[in-house]
Amino acid sequence: MEYQYPIDLDWSNDEMMQVVSFFNAVESYYESSVEGEKLLDRYKQFKKIVPGKAEEKQIFKEFENSSGYSSYHAVKAVQSSPDQKLFSAKSK
């Protein structure tokens, strides 16, 4: 799938890589499966870079508009079932 990740040019290279890593975990949730702990760890790193709720919503919306994948729903699915190890949108 061809699309661009929502990246802020003010972020450092390391921050950009961490944000992309989070979105890669979201992609795994929709395309195959992802470990819940891995997705939440990457989300925590994302939140260190994007602490504001409004900015998070904007970035999530940009990503969903370009990819079709809802970061919000992926994170909520994992948070709502803390005992489950693997998560996938395909197994719903």
Swiss-Prot record:
It comes from the Bacteria. InterPro entries: BH2638-like_sf, UPF0223. Belongs to the UPF0223 family. HAMAP family: UPF0223 (MF_01041). NCBIfam families: PRK04387.1 (NF003353). This is UPF0223 protein SSP1692. It comes from Staphylococcus saprophyticus subsp. saprophyticus (strain ATCC 15305 / DSM 20229 / NCIMB 8711 / NCTC 7292 / S-41).
